[in-house]
Amino acid sequence: NTNKLMVDSLSKKFVEAKSKSNQSIRYKADFFSKSIARIKKGETVSIVQDFNSNEDTELNGWVRVRTSSGIIGYVKKSSIKDRIVVRDNLTREKINGKVSIMWDYYSPYDPCPARTDKIQGVNAVSPSFFELMSNGDIKTNIGDSGKKYVTWAKNNGYKVWPTLSNTFLNNKDAVSKMMSTFETREYLIENIVNSLIDADVDGINIDLENMYKEDKDKYSRFIIELAPRIRDLGMTLCVDVTEPDGSDTWSLCYDRHTLAETADYLVFIGYDQHNNSSKEAGTVAGYDWEEKNIKKFLGPQEGISSDKLILAMPFYTRLWRESNGKITSKVVNMKDVKIPSNVKVTWDDTTKQNYYEYEENGTTYKMWIEDETSISNKLNLVNQYNLAGAGFWEKDRETPDVWQVVK
């Protein structure tokens, strides 16, 4: 005995019909072809759909069918009746034009922020609904406030692509174990799918960072296995990655080409060029650095199509302090940038940012400012390289005027 496993895509049309009489199913579309099965009068068969046209597979008056036991062959089209479309094509409603996604981050232990106003220039939002746990479970933080958030977003025409993050887990070994086998990946995928269905959203943004370089291919396999499940839901899959060249666990843990080929969008996390571990002061996201990396993404190094790449940009900067040979910095939100009196702001044409530097009590202070001008220049890169869109990290760090630039 041979056991057959039948797999149908939930995103494809599914058609059934009934046999008008007891008859044979033929191997080929011909009366002289051998009989491979018998069906009875009134028995239901599914009509095989052509992969390209998504219409009934017909040949010279014959139609291709599948029995309930999984046998596929041909019967005369005139010998079946009561054709019915059980499930039509599931089409995903795509964003018209460029993606403009706003991340709305909040701790998994805090309620989802309340939003009431329409945000100009945004067509997708990514609240922090999902946090990865060490055993492959997902900590879901939605609640009543999250449900209201989804309603607010949809009422304003925004797609909702919540983020799944491993920020709080921050455990490379745990992520490695999750990616190690088909069974562990499938467990995580099932949890993701169920969480998305329960949340009633439009897609997901996968933001898994700080992984082992050795797990690069397994992570790609995870996304490859996840993608059809997301598409079967009629949803969008968005995957975040860092700049192409860097450390093993920050940059070299991603196969960007494979991820871009598999997902709907690949997000370049276009910030943290300099961070709290940097040994020299510098911008968080310089124009020159972003352009250099965009060229790597689109060029032969990564080979990614421009219509797959989203450039994410920061609504924050850093204030640097240099004293006694030591360098420290702190994050300053765009809306909280304050320029001391009597300090001259200059233009840095390399980073395309306003910049100031001054000395006080033996300490040198430096800041590359993120403002409407710097964001405007970064948006120029999106248009210049015909990227899929832009992303903004994150809501409530910005000045109100920046949304007019985004718009």
Predicted regions and their residues:
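Short, acidic/polar
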Residues: 104-120, 180-197, 248-257, 370-383
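Glycan-binding loop/region signatures in secreted carbohydrate-active enzymes
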Residues: 308, 313-380
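Glycan-recognition patch characteristic of GH18 chitinases/ENGases
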Residues: 84-191
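SH3/SH3-like beta-barrel superfamily modules
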Residues: 1-3, 38-78
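Active-site groove signature of glycoside hydrolases
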Residues: 126-129, 187-218, 265-278, 391
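Hydrophobic faces of well-ordered beta-strands that scaffold small-molecule active sites
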Residues: 100-104, 123-127, 160-164, 204-206, ...
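Substrate-binding surface in catalytic domains of secreted glycosidases
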Residues: 134-144, 190, 213-340
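Boundary regions of SH3-family modules and the immediately adjacent low-complexity/disordered segments
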Residues: 1-16, 66-99
